[in-house]
Design a protein with these regions (language model features):
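Family-specific signature for flavin-dependent thymidylate synthase
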Residues: 1-200
């Protein structure tokens, strides 16, 4: 199961956002102005604030995270790191296979004849790794709808829900406007919600 810890955030983010937004009009912006800016899609103002999380997730989700732009990553090394846990899918054959691959990898790390960088090729995508991720508010604002979507993997959706909950608790003036674009989504064949895309 993924875990998330908020370790750093811009101090007094609304003050920063109002100051930045006010530059356009040469006067201090209000919460109402921030709301208007977000609703109009003028999200560049959100780039002046950031949030940093410590995350534990599978290699599979780590790879998905790196597809999102304007996030910065520092990851646990894959060279010589012993594996102790993995994301359990609930599918017996899959989970047993991942556990077996982890054992092979750990044994390879203890084998002096196998270079650690070569042993790393055996790491299963289900293995859990730790990383620190930093993104500005715009990056998180654009990340969340994509990974809160029911089409996202179960693990990544759970991770996104945790991140969203923490951001919403700290800055509801911004993150209450995160919405899922189900009615306008162009993905085809969604089995959860009728979208504008071609249906299967």
């Amino acid at each position: 199961m993924p875990s998330v810890k908020l370790i750093s955030m811009t101090q007094d983010p609304m003050e920063v956002l109002k100051t930045a937004a006010g530059m356009c009009y040469q006067k201090k912006a209000t919460d109402k102005v921030i709301k208007h800016i977000i609703e109009c899609g003028h999200l560049s103002v959100l780039e002046h604030c950031y949030a940093t999380f410590e995350i534990t997730c599978s290699v599979a989700v780590l790879l998905q995270l790196t597809r999102h732009r304007h996030l910065s990553f520092t990851c646990q090394s894959t060279r010589g790191s012993r594996l102790t846990s993995y994301y359990e899918t609930g599918v017996h054959d899959v989970d047993c296979s991942v556990a077996e691959q982890m054992d092979f990898y750990n044994e390879a790390c203890d084998n002096p004849d196998i270079p650690l960088e070569d042993a790393a090729y055996q790491i299963p995508k289900g293995a859990e790794y730790k990383l620190v991720v930093t993104g500005n508010f715009r990056a998180w604002f654009e990340y969340l709808p994509k990974r809160l979507c029911k089409r996202a993997s179960k693990e990544h959706r759970l991770l996104a829900q945790m991140i969203y909950g923490m951001l919403y608790a700290k800055v509801p003036e911004v993150f209450s406007y995160v919405t899922l674009p189900c009615e306008t989504c162009k993905e085809s064949g969604c089995s959860f919600v009728k979208t504008k895309g071609k249906q299967e």
